[in-house]
């Protein structure tokens, strides 16, 4: 009787673990970033390239004012990049489920409500100035459950109606930055 109980318990344990063992692991192969604004340099540095369900990839987004004049940047939730997500199309419809990028700033902001099922946002914009030579940076994480498979993912605003904007004078213009993240599945030993 004890042997049967042991065999049953062992089989259930192995079956339970098989889902975890079979989860795909990914690697960030490449990131590209640019902005269409001459006086702003936008770059993304991959800090942790491997991504699984338990361990996220980590990126540092950097925005630098390379011009001679101050630039005001306006966004929602957190400054300067706002709430962002990844989609497999740069022109994604954000009403379709996206892979959210998480940030410690989301947790500490009183303008962002993070829930297991998504995020909420206080619609009050945040405007700050980036002086010449000054940099703003933010660390983001991409968890394995947010990845839908291999391919190139594009960073987009989490909400369509919260596009960032910038001003060098009195007129605000949509802030267009572009970032692509190429993700590859890692080779795994057969189970």
Predicted regions and their residues:
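Hydrophobic alpha-helical segments
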Residues: 1-85, 90-99, 116, 120-191
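Short, basic/aromatic beta-hairpin or loop at an interaction surface
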Residues: 107-116
């Amino acid at each position: 009787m004890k042997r049967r109980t042991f065999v049953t318990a062992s089989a259930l344990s192995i079956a339970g673990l098989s889902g975890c063992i079979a989860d795909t692991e990914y690697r960030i192969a490449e990131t590209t970033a640019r902005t269409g604004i001459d006086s702003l340099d936008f770059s993304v540095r991959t800090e942790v390239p491997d991504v699984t369900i338990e361990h996220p990839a980590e990126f540092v987004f950097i925005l630098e004012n390379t011009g001679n004049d101050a630039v005001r940047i306006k966004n929602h939730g957190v400054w300067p990049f706002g709430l962002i997500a990844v989609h497999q199309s740069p022109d994604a419809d954000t009403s379709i489920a996206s892979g959210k990028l998480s940030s410690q700033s989301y947790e500490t902001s009183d303008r962002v409500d993070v829930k297991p099922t998504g995020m909420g946002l206080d619609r009050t914009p945040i405007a700050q100035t980036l002086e010449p030579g000054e940099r703003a940076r933010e660390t983001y994480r991409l968890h394995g459950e947010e990845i839908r498979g291999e391919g190139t993912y594009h960073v987009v605003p989490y909400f369509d109606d919260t596009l960032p904007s910038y001003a060098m004078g009195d007129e605000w213009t949509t802030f267009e930055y572009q970032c692509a993240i190429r993700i590859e599945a890692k080779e795994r030993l057969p189970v």
